[in-house]
Amino acid sequence: MSDQLIDRTMAFAGILQAVAQVQHIARHGNSDRDSLAACLNTVLVTNPDTTSDVYADKVALNKGYQLIINQLGDAKDKDVEVTRYLVGILALERKLARGNAMSILSERINQIHRQLHHFEITDEQVIANFAGIYSDIISTLGPKIQISGNPEYLKQSQVQEKIRALLLSAMRSAVLWRQLGGKRRHLVFARKTIVDTAKKSLTL
């Protein structure tokens, strides 16, 4: 098992970790603070020495690994909603990679770094800034990702901002996955290898 495969699977788990949080918040209106923080922190690590540096909370990443096993493995009960979100994120990432928005994205992330001198990463104002980056830079690139869930929660501004912030986190992992050589065809032709890597990467 190559280091690049391990790293690429880690980044893919990062996408699904964030997507799982989006799904949970959309359905239940709340989020686990540690899981939310773990996702948001990945956005801030822009010059990592290793892929592992991006995902400091290895336990939180387990949800992503479990989803890889479920979505790409032999399980019959695959989550169609998770697949739809994943397809949407990967489509937007391709448009981001082709455009010139990266420098603007970098500056906006630097603003959040400065904000963290005064606030925690899960503070409402910080989450609103993450959400603003997604709205201003990412969601303008292509068709919006349609989120399913409880309408009562989805109309709440705080829920909307958390969802957008988490979609930004998913996008960060998608960018990293692509940088590590990730390609859509791997999800079809190398599924078993990816699933095996996810199983070995699970932190128990």
Curated annotation (Swiss-Prot):
UniProt xrefs under Pfam families: DUF489
Subcellular location(s) per record: Cytoplasm; Cell inner membrane
SUPFAM superfamilies: YcfC-like (SSF101322)
Keywords, alphabetical: Cell inner membrane, Cell membrane, Cytoplasm, Membrane
Record bears the keyword tRNA processing: no
CC terms in the record's Gene Ontology section: cytoplasm; plasma membrane
Membrane topology: Peripheral membrane protein
Presence of keyword Cytoplasm: yes
Similarity remark: Belongs to the HflD family.
Protein name per UniProt: High frequency lysogenization protein HflD homolog
Organism: Shewanella sediminis (strain HAW-EB3)
This protein's encoding gene: hflD
